[in-house]
């Protein structure tokens, strides 16, 4: 399931996101499993409303996890066309099933940015090294 996506991985920012092409310039955006494990337990998520225009790296959502509140930046410039009401009601879905619990869908406004994303194969070593370095417990993640 995680291999059919592209990724934005910036370990120094503890940023691990997935992006899935839904066709017609629409992209689903979610939290990769390592970030879902780091953000356990996720208490709340506030997602920008449908119609919001965002530039690359602007806050797509605000997440509250443990004792932290952090922004979840957008990996692509675009317009929010859908938000996942289920994860707003039950944020812990992201912790347990990060690849089926998308956060928002964007209509991309700069398709060149997609070229900056990486395949699952390209991120494996970086993610494994980070898990070892930070001693990340990914056991909460079911998928």
Curated annotation (Swiss-Prot):
Statement: the UniProt record of this protein carries the keyword tRNA processing: no
Pfam family, one: GCV_H
Modified residues (N6-lipoyllysine): 67
Residues of the signal peptide: none
Keyword vocabulary terms for this entry: Lipoyl
GO cellular component, one term: glycine cleavage complex
A single BP term in Gene Ontology: glycine decarboxylation via glycine cleavage system
Cofactor(s) the protein requires to work: (R)-lipoate
Record PROSITE patterns: BIOTINYL_LIPOYL
Domain Lipoyl-binding: 26-107
Keyword Membrane: no
Free-text cofactor note: Binds 1 lipoyl cofactor covalently.
SUPFAM superfamilies: Single hybrid motif
PANTHER family referenced in this protein's UniProt entry, alphabetically: GLYCINE CLEAVAGE SYSTEM H PROTEIN, GLYCINE CLEAVAGE SYSTEM H PROTEIN-RELATED
Similarity comment: family membership: Belongs to the GcvH family.
Subunit structure and binding partners: The glycine cleavage system is composed of four proteins: P, T, L and H.
HAMAP family according to UniProt: GcvH
Function: The glycine cleavage system catalyzes the degradation of glycine. The H protein shuttles the methylamine group of glycine from the P protein to the T protein.
Name recorded for this polypeptide: Glycine cleavage system H protein 1
Source organism: Aquifex aeolicus (strain VF5)
């Amino acid at each position: 399931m995680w291999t059919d996506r592209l990724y934005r991985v910036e370990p120094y920012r503890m940023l691990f996101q997935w992006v899935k092409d839904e066709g017609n310039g629409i992209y689903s955006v979610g939290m990769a499993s390592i970030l879902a494990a780091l953000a356990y337990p996720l208490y709340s998520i506030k997602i920008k409303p449908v119609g919001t225009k965002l530039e690359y790296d602007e806050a797509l959502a605000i997440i509250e996890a443990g004792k932290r509140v952090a922004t979840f930046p957008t990996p692509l410039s675009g317009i929010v066309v859908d938000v996942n009401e289920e994860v707003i009601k039950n944020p812990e879905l992201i912790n347990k099933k990060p690849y089926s619990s998308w956060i928002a869908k964007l209509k991309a406004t700069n398709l060149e940015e997609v070229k900056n994303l990486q395949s699952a194969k390209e991120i494996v070593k970086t993610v494994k090294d980070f898990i070892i370095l930070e001693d990340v417990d990914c056991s909460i993640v079911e998928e």
